[in-house]
């Protein structure tokens, strides 16, 4: 548990990336280079577990991105193995636009005990509202599997908030997490076009840019029951992101929702 102003909170970090040891350092460096940001840690599973546990975290939502379709199976087996090794980990499956048998792949993801899928359209080279992805979204919706979408980047339209809004116009029951408070560098656009009963957001890679008033406007737009704390590990440490989160000045009830309760409810833990 984490402690703030004498109050103890259960805490889940709802956005973390992990990589196998042989590629972790290179993968971490590549992400830092893409965003032109220094990385606080290396994306190794044991580093996440140790660093987050030392701060008091109870759960970590872990994922990795497949940039090639042939990587999907091995990534998902890796994520599942690390979730078995580290009981605090809750895993999401990797996905790729070029997967041919959607139902078979989702069966395998669920058989591995994974709780949804992660998409990063900027890294994977497709728009969120690509027609080829609609059968995937429909299949996830039918299985009640959440999808974590990387959202936003001023340099790309592939992950623009409007792209997810286009999908939700067709599939309003799709359970989705719009990462980075709805859209990194595109927070105003996210507030303009994203909201709904099945839209969650996380706070990852947002609080280092937004001042507390700006962050609160985004949080209150989406609703206190739909916001989850996230770090974007290995980009930021849990300690630093917690400091930024508590600087928003919310009360005990709101903190409990965003730090753990919303995460627990979404993933049915």
Label each PLM-derived region with a short phrase:
Residues 58-59, 67-148, 153, 209:
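Active-site gating/metal-coordination segments in enzymes
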Residues 12-21, 120, 150, 180:
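Histidine-centered divalent metal-coordination motifs
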Residues 115-116, 130-228:
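Catalytic pocket-lining loop regions of alpha/beta-barrel enzymes
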Residues 18-22, 67-70, 97-101, 124, ...:
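Active-site environment of divalent metal-dependent phosphoester hydrolases
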Residues 47-51, 75-82, 105-109, 132-136, ...:
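A general structural detector for well-ordered alpha-helical segments in enzyme core domains, enriched
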Residues 10-19, 109, 136, 170, ...:
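A generic "structured core" feature
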Residues 15, 52, 79, 109, ...:
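Conserved, mostly hydrophobic/aromatic
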Residues 1-14, 24-59, 224-226, 238-269:
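Mid-to-C-terminal alpha-helical segments outside catalytic/metal-binding sites
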């Amino acid at each position: 548990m984490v402690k703030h102003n004498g109050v103890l909170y259960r805490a889940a970090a709802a956005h973390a990336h992990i990589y196998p040891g042989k590629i972790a350092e290179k993968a971490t460096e590549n992400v830092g280079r893409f965003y032109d940001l220094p990385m606080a840690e290396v994306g190794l599973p044991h580093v996440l577990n140790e660093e987050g546990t030392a701060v008091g975290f109870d759960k970590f939502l872990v994922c990795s991105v497949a940039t090639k379709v042939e990587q999907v199976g091995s990534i998902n087996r890796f994520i599942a193995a690390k979730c078995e090794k580290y009981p605090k980990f809750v895993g999401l499956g990797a996905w790729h636009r070029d997967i041919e048998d959607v139902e078979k792949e989702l069966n395998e993801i669920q058989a591995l005990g994974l709780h949804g899928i992660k998409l990063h359209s900027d890294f994977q080279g497709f728009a969120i509202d690509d027609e080829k992805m609609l059968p995937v979204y429909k299949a996830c919706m039918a299985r009640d599997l959440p999808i974590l979408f990387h959202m936003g980047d001023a340099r790309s339209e592939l992950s623009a908030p409007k792209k997810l809004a286009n999908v939700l116009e067709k599939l309003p029951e799709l359970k989705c997490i719009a990462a980075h408070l709805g859209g990194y560098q595109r927070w105003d656009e996210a507030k303009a076009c994203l909201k709904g009963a099945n839209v969650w957001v996380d706070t990852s890679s947002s609080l280092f840019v937004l001042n507390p008033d700006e962050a609160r406007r985004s949080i209150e737009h989406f609703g206190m029951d739909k916001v989850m704390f996230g770090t974007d590990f290995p980009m930021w440490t849990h300690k630093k992101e917690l400091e930024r989160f508590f600087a928003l000045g919310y009360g005990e009830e709101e903190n409990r929702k965003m730090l753990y309760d919303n995460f627990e409810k979404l993933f049915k833990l």
